[in-house]
Each structure stands twice: as structure tokens, then as C-alpha cells.
From Swiss-Prot:
Keywords: Amino-acid biosynthesis, Aromatic amino acid biosynthesis, Cytoplasm, Transferase. Belongs to the EPSP synthase family. The active site is at 315 (proton acceptor). GO terms for cellular component: cytoplasm. It comes from Pelotomaculum thermopropionicum (strain DSM 13744 / JCM 10971 / SI). GO terms for molecular function: 3-phosphoshikimate 1-carboxyvinyltransferase activity. It is found in: Cytoplasm. Phosphoenolpyruvate binds at residues 21, 94, 122, 169, 346, 388. This is 3-phosphoshikimate 1-carboxyvinyltransferase.
Amino acid sequence: MDLHVGKSRGLRGTVAVPGDKSISHRAVMLGALASGETIIENFLPGEDCLSTIDCFRKLGVEINGPDNNTVRVRGRGLDGLSEPVDVLDTGNSGTTMRLILGVLAGQPFFSVITGDSSLRRRPMGRVTGPLISMGAKIDGRQNGNLAPLAVRGGTLRPINFVSPVASAQVKSAVLLAGLFTDGVTAVTEAYRTRDHTERMLRAFGAGVEVSEGTVAVKGRPRLTGRKVKVPGDISSAAFLLVAASLIPGSDLTLTGVGVNPTRIGIIEVLSSMGAEIRLFNLREEEEPVADIRVRYNGRLCGTAVGGEIIPRLIDEVPALAVAAALAEGKTVIRDAAELKVKESDRIAAVAGMLAKFGADVEELPDGLLVRGSRALKGCVCESHGDHRIAMAAAVAGLLAEGKTIVRGAECISVSFPGFSDLLAKVMVDWQ
């Protein structure tokens, strides 16, 4: 599918972005492992989260929905999953594959898990390694680094794991496996990553301790089903925040967005570049939530981004790079080599996409160098099958002279179904 975009005269109005993808995944998983019913409201009905539902149905869990973005999960308890009669297909979802591996590691049965061609190229050894050290038997291509993966779960032992990468998916997989041990499993990270798993484990009844970069979970808890209200996804909101910060005449409010401190790096960086972004109506639900107002405030300034903030905005780098292309001066993004093993090589994909628009951009081994302030020109660009590249290109198209066509834009439905309709709703008009 092609997405056609023209230069915008402003984004105005009040809208809600879809439910958070990370939280939607985790709510289904913990609901399946809990006793009783879990009701998930504002669930993200994107392809990735639907893959998680499909996998747990194959593991014997009764799941109804999504119906009006509500999902009901009838939990089976920690020991209630069934051996799947078919391969578990996680589609394009790295979150589904990595987190469900932690669950499968503790099951007394055999399973095989795979994904689409993109996911089968992404590294899984960072997860299978610690799970094997806990006692799981996992095999696959490149000694268990690439899917398809065959898992023979069973009795696991707790470990103290020091993660070599700043990855919430790795942390979460090990913590989920820790639920099936007799003891305490701990994960230590160099940089803090998103903490949705820890928060949700606590909410469902697990014993979780957090201290100085280490998260520990006590095994064999009794998890109890509950209601989960999923906030709007800050990663989806990021594209609208960038667009409204850059397009003169914009005044946009996004309601009910999750503002977990481990996820709002994009707001911090855009604000430091000069964007006018205000959080209001702050409230604490399952997660911190706020309404966000962003208004055009003149040209942004370049900046340097790296270190501990990178895990807090890793998914937003494509959107941030578009802001950098229109900012005054130079923006350097470092310590983001993890982008090379996302749905695409996002460093190369972002650099190539921005270059097509005429931006001055250079790939770095672990990030990007963007020399801003050049006017962008509409172009035809590829999504590379990556939802975040497609949306970043669409935002660039809103700022470029002439027409822009984003090829392969159907991938946007992975995380932001209805993206183009929402854009049309808040667009003042097209040039």
C-alpha cells in the first residue's frame, strides 16, 4: 500500500493515540498466567499484539476479542498452559517472540516458535542464552541465535543475570522465566529500560524488588486476574509531537498518553531542542498517564543524544531524526547500535530515507549525524517493512515541498492502525 502525503499547514485538534503496544503484549501474557479473568481495555489491535493473542490461544488460553479494543483473557495459572499442536508464529513481533520464550522455558512440554522473514534475521541469543543457563533446552539456527527455535522447557533454576544489552525484552524474558523457579531471579542492567513488566508483575501479585539497576522477582507467585487499562502509546504519539513541533500553526493535544519515566526521553529531547510541549491532567492509573499539548514554537535547535537516555527513546529515534533534519545546527545521536537489529537496520533506513528528502545525514557506527535546516523535498521512499520508518517518512512528507509517496505503508498497522485517518483528522489542510 502506498501512502500519499503533502505539505501541511498545521496540525490542530484533540485526539487520542492507540493503546501502548508494550503494555498490551504484557497484559495478555500475564493475564494468561494468572488465575481468573483479566479484562484489558484500550488494547492495541495492531498486528504485533494480535500475534501475542494467537500464540497464547495455541497454548490453550481462552481469549475473547479484541472487541471495541477490549480483550478478555481467561487465565490458566502458571501451570495451566498446554503443549501447542502447531508452530507458534509471532509474525513481525520481536516482543512476542522474546517474552514468550521466557514463558515457554518454564513449561514441561515441547514447542517451536518462529516469525516472519524479518524476525527470523533478528538476534535471539541474547534471550536464549540466559534461559539455557536457567535449565531450558533451546535450539535453533546459529546455536539458538536465530528463529525458528525449538524449546523443551521444564524445571528452571533462578539466576542473577547481568544483561550485556540495554533491552527491556531481555530483562522481561528472564523475569518471566523466573516466575517458574523456586527462588529469586534477578536482572541487572547498565542503563534503565522500560519497566512495564515489573509494574505489571506487581499489579498481578508477584513479589518484585527494584534497587540500583537490578530487578528481582520471586518465583512461584499466585497471579490474580484483574482489569488493565492500557494508556496511549508514547511511541506512536512521538510522530505527532515531532510534526506539530515543526509545522507552523500547529496546536495539538493528545489525550491519555502513557508518560512512564522510562519512556519519555523523546519529550525531554524535543523540549531541550526548543519544542513547546506541556503535560497536564497527570494521573496515576496502572501507569503514569497525562494529556500532552504541543504547539509550534519556532525552529528547533540541534542537540547531542546518547548514553542513558537512549533506552528511553530507542523506538523514537526515527521520529527524532526527522526533527533533527529541520533543526538549526547539528544533531548527533550515539550509543544506538541496537537500532541495527530492529525490524530493519534503522540507522541505515533512516539515513537513506532522509537523504531522499534532501537532508544532510550521515550514518555512524552507533547512530546518526544530521546537519539540519535544509528544506526537504517530496520524494518516493520505501518503508523497508518497518512501521516506524514508514511513519517517520510520512512526517517528513508533511514538512517537504511537493508530494511524498511512502511505499509499503501497510506495515504501519503493526503499531498504529488508523494512522492516516488520524492525520487527516488533525490536518488543517494540504498544500
